């Protein structure tokens, strides 16, 4: 499956940026779609529309954690170090392609109103968010190809 196309479709059909990326990978993470949508919901708009870390980036990291993360019982087997290395590499790639991982910088200082605006067709023409979602999903697919998931 091309997760980047699917993530873009999810975003264009009303999912938030973070939800679109996280939901696009439910086939890989095994996380229930309804639960995934709830987990990702606070991260849209740069975390609750505060315009901090881009929601697509947050969604990307949630997928990364679901696939390669560690839990509180894990011994130090290098997973934490590898995970943080991958987080930083993804951030660098996203910055290189999109200019920033910070929502307010990507959107050129929009208001942080907690009330999301309606999303008519004009919304999608003015915002780069769909491109951020597609980029985040593509970068994730590249990482997954480099680090196949252990069953």
Give names to the regions the model predicted.
Residues 1-29:
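Active-site-proximal helix-loop elements at catalytic-domain edges
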Residues 5-12, 43-51, 121-126:
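A short glycine/serine-rich beta->alpha loop
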Residues 17, 54, 103:
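Short cysteine clusters
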Residues 24-42, 106-113:
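Acidic-glycine-rich active-site phosphate/pyrophosphate-binding loop
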Residues 28-38, 66-86, 148:
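Phosphate-handling active-site elements
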Residues 49-60:
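Conserved alpha-helical segments that form or flank metal/cofactor-binding pockets of metalloenzymes
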Residues 59-67:
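DPxDG-like acidic metal-binding loop motif
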Residues 83-151:
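C-terminal binding/interaction regions
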């Amino acid at each position: 499956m091309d997760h980047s196309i699917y993530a873009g479709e999810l975003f264009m059909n009303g999912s938030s940026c973070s939800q679109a990326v996280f939901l696009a990978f439910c086939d890989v993470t095994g996380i229930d779609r309804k639960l995934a949508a709830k987990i990702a919901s606070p991260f849209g708009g740069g975390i609750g529309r505060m315009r901090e870390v881009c929601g697509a980036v947050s969604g990307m990291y949630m997928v990364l954690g679901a696939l390669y993360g560690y839990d509180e019982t894990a011994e130090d087997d290098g997973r934490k170090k590898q995970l943080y290395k991958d987080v930083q590499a993804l951030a660098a790639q996203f910055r290189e392609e999109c200019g920033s991982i910070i929502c307010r910088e990507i959107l050129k200082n929009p208001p942080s109103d907690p009330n999301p605006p309606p999303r008519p067709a004009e919304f999608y023409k003015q915002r780069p968010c769909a491109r951020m979602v597609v980029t985040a999903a593509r970068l994730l697919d590249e990482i997954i190809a480099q680090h196949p998931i252990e069953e």
